[in-house]
UniProtKB/Swiss-Prot annotation:
Keyword field: RNA-binding, Stress response
A molecular function (GO) term: RNA binding
GO biological process terms on file: regulation of DNA-templated transcription; regulation of RNA stability; regulation of translation, ncRNA-mediated
Database matches in Pfam families: Hfq
Domain Sm: from-to ranges: 10-70
Gene3D superfamilies found in the cross-reference section: 2.30.30.100
Keyword Cell membrane tagged: no
Keyword RNA-binding listed: yes
Protein name: RNA-binding protein Hfq
A cellular component term, taken from the record's GO annotations: cytosol
InterPro entries: Hfq, LSM_dom_sf, Sm
Underlying gene: hfq
Naturally occurring in which organism (per UniProt): Clostridium botulinum (strain Eklund 17B / Type B)
């Protein structure tokens, strides 16, 4: 019962982070940010963009597009 179940969002972001895959994050303002995911939690994503670290609130994100497709295989379970 203590086992935490991963959701698609966590699997997606964790795979992008582990593989250091470049992503484009689209914000609700229409702004685009390119970079690599360094970490995330329930409310935020840490992105490295051109050598600068950004803390982006998930409620401001509309879309995350990876450079290559991400496979939805949860190898940690």
């Amino acid at each position: 019962m203590n086992k935490q179940q991963n959701n698609l969002q966590d699997i997606f972001l964790n795979s992008a982070r582990k593989n250091k895959m470049p992503v484009t994050i689209y914000l609700s303002t229409g702004f685009q940010i390119n970079g690599t995911v360094k970490g995330f939690d329930s409310f935020t994503v840490i992105l490295d963009s051109e050598g600068k670290q950004m803390l982006i609130y998930k409620h401001a994100i509309t879309t995350v597009t990876p450079e290559k497709p991400i496979l939805f295989v949860d190898n940690e379970s």
